[in-house]
Amino acid sequence: MSDKAGSRATMRGWAIRAYGEEMVLMNELPIPTPGPHDILMQMRSAEVGDWDELVRAGEWDMERPFPLVLGLAGAGRIAAVGAAVTDFSENQEVYAYSYPLHDNGAWAEFMLVPQSHVAPIPASLTPVEAGGVPIVGLTAHETLIDVLRVTRGEVVLINAAAGGVGHIAVQIASGLGAHVVAAASRRNHDFVAGLGAAAVIDYDATGDVAKAIRAQYPGGVDKALNCVSGKAANDYVAALADGGKMVDLPGAVSVQRAGVQIISDYVVRGNGARLAELTRRFDSGALRLVVHEIFRFDEAPRALDLVLARHVRGKVVIRTT
């Protein structure tokens, strides 16, 4: 283990003592020790998303002991590697997503992850920016390519298109040759159009969003990625074409409709190989990350509050070091 971690036994981290409790900054959490196939990351930054609130509230049980450090993904410098790790070495800048948590979470000075969940960060991003990629990047990439199997010429609807998952999904879908219909607030129309959306629907001004979509696409959309919660999610089901398919990330859709397929509560797992593919896409210029705001480590609760207010363009990141 490097001197940076080896000279210390404890670290700081934002943790909860039980599900449903408020997070607190703890100063003497144990620094994890890598097993044979593990990587210990000294964190540069951590991703923030509404999933962090699901973990805090106990809706996503991590099956880990308390105190539980929050945060599922981020970027950092490799502080130590397990004896069986051959593809990575100390001091490499990497990023990772760990769900369910392998050990502790990312909102700490160090995070322990399996080597299979790790990839080098894009050279086109700073280590702090890179911490905003893993969850939203993996989610957009996996749902569009593996689950929805988006192909050239298909009409693909992406709502909350200016958000974390949404703004990456618009770029991936348009890069696949799809005709992207993005749903976003008026202030974000130029933003999502600049990412590759062929059409933008103003969900704030539209009383019936499905009707507005079908006014432009009478046959409906072929595929849809739903990123919104609440009753609003149901409105998008009517926009699907017969035989259409939707991935409903939050599991918010409660209506049924014959002739369409809805895959609910879809959650990606850690995948270093797919993260490496995202790295290649960022470095080729096919993808760009928009960071809404970077918070200091001691401002983690404020960062989560901002995300939950749902007025974020792109990603919110915590700078951990």
Regions flagged by a language model, labelled:
Residues C227-R288, T320-T321:
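Glycine-rich phosphate-binding loop and adjacent beta-alpha segment
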Residues L101-Q115:
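A structural motif shared across PLP-dependent enzymes of the aminotransferase-like
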Residues Q92-E93, F110, V155, G175, ...:
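Residue-level marker of beta-strand positions
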Residues P30-E47, E59-P100:
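Glycine-rich beta-strand-centered segment in the early N-terminal region that forms part
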Residues G207-G219:
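Short amphipathic alpha-helix with an adjacent loop that forms part of the alpha/beta core around
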Residues F88-S89, V150, L240:
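Short, well-ordered loop/turn sites that connect or cap secondary structure elements
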